[in-house]
Each structure stands twice: as structure tokens, then as C-alpha cells.
From Swiss-Prot:
This is Alpha-pompilidotoxin. Changing residue 54 to R: 5-fold increase in potency (This mutant corresponds to beta-PMTX). 5-fold increase in potency. 3-fold increase in potency. 3-fold increase in potency. The modification Leucine amide is found at residue 55. Changing residue 51 to L: 1.25-fold decrease in potency. It comes from Anoplius samariensis. Negative results: does not or very slightly inactivate hNav1.4/SCN4A and hNav1.5/SCN5A sodium channels. Potency in mutagenesis experiments is measured by the concentration of these mutant toxins for inducing repetitive action potentials. Changing residue 52 to T: Complete loss of potency. It is found in: Secreted.
Length: 56
């Protein structure tokens, strides 16, 4: 019975660590995606203008 209590306590600590570490990681990832998409568009446009200026 003593081993079961230790295992239960370890499982509770493990779950609390996972829950507390998962919440902050979700917010920056959600905020990083629109920034990555917004920064990709001007690079594509600049690349197109460079290609057109080389042709003309």
C-alpha cells in the first residue's frame, strides 16, 4: 500500500508539471504563426520585383 501511495503522488506531480508546462507553450505558438505568415509575404513580393527589374 505504501508503494501505491508513492506511485500515486509521483503520477500527480507528473501530471501537474505537464499541465503547467503545456499552457505557456500554447500561447507563443499561436501568436507566432500570424507573424511568420505576415513576414513571408513581403519577401515574396520583393523577390518578384527583383526578378522583374532584372528582366527589364
Amino acid at each position: 500500500m505504501f508503494k501505491q501511495l508513492i506511485l500515486l503522488a509521483l503520477a500527480a506531480v507528473f501530471l501537474l508539471i505537464n499541465i503547467s508546462s503545456a499552457e505557456p507553450a500554447a500561447e507563443p505558438n499561436a501568436n507566432a504563426e500570424p507573424l511568420a505568415e505576415a513576414s513571408a509575404e513581403p519577401r515574396i513580393k520583393i523577390g518578384l520585383f527583383d526578378q522583374l527589374s532584372k528582366l527589364g
